[in-house]
Amino acid sequence: MSYFRYIDNGEGPTKLFIGGVHGDEGKDVLPLIKLLSYEDFSPGQIYIYNFDKTPYISTIHKEFYQSEQGKKILDLIDYYKPDFYTELHSYNIKHFDRLTSLERLDSQGIPPLIDCGQYVLCSSVSPLIRRKHFTKQNICQTLEFPSFRGEDLNLSDDELFEKYDYSYDLSVEEYMSFLRLITLSKNRDDFEKRVLKDYKKQADLALKYVKIIYGLDFPRY
């Protein structure tokens, strides 16, 4: 069943979080969403959605935003007009190297995802919506949590660690660390300070990539 949570924290930024963006990713991120407590949020209006399984269409393709699910997400964005917009995704851990490779710029015209550690990845949102549905002052983030498909589902925790040097608990800790950075930030300046303190390397990469895609005068988030 789809999940929705609203938190009225008074005056402050509007924050929209969406999990289960496409495919069956919602089952991976819902347990993480439920780890967030009331104390994890800044003042403001908080809206959290996690959707059931839908057909998988990549958000870097315009066909996604023409689909029923894509239109639903755009309607939420245009309705709430969030100051902070965060997509909560999961991905097949086998694709880690491909998703973080600079070859994505040549093959797909988009920058690679950025490694935050423990197989957790971050980036901005799809270029197809970043400028059309948001302002430069808005914070737009994508967070990706590692998941498993196919034969990997049959491996034990020890076997997964041996194959990928992967720990579920450490990935959860890293994912929640970045997610709480977003949930706790009171505005763009606060977010910038938190990112530069805890994720300086990733922030520098984000700036490099945004210059390639949007030019010099566009924010990295």
Predicted features along the sequence, with ranges:
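Structured catalytic-domain cores with a bias toward divalent-metal coordination
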Residues: 1-221
